[in-house]
Amino acid sequence: MSKVTVVEGEIYRDARGQISSLNNFHFEGVKRCYIIHHPDTSVVRGWNGHQFERKWFYCLKGSFTVALVEVDNWENPSQELEAEVYNLSEQESRIVCVPAGYANCIKAFEKDSILLVLSDKTMEEAAGDSWKYDKNLWVDWSKY
């Protein structure tokens, strides 16, 4: 059973414009945020793993595929791990909540897509908890 959760938000539209909210998401534990600007749809960013760091992903512009795996062995993970794949879009207000112990890999569906990433660790706390794996592991990105 997956430990990843998705919090659904709301989008309100009227003649004045649009409000996207995450009223059911609580920012408890968030210490840092950053924004990824994805230049085009051919770039695959990842795999980046974090043994102790939690992450949250929210699409600000365009759309993304976010793939996640729970890593079984940080030094030599199984090539047979099954990825969980989530699609995020500016058309839907939803945030993917990733517990510690996962690796992530992302790809934009649309040129110039923008992804907000939140973390429960400061840069200093996260410095020793960054694991990199080949982007071709676990997901066939030609399908996305």
For the regions a protein language model found, what residue spans apply to each?
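Non-catalytic, conserved peripheral segments adjacent to functional cores
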Residues: 1-92, 111-144
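Short beta-strand His + acidic residue motifs that chelate non-heme Fe in jelly-roll/DSBH
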Residues: 19, 96, 104-109
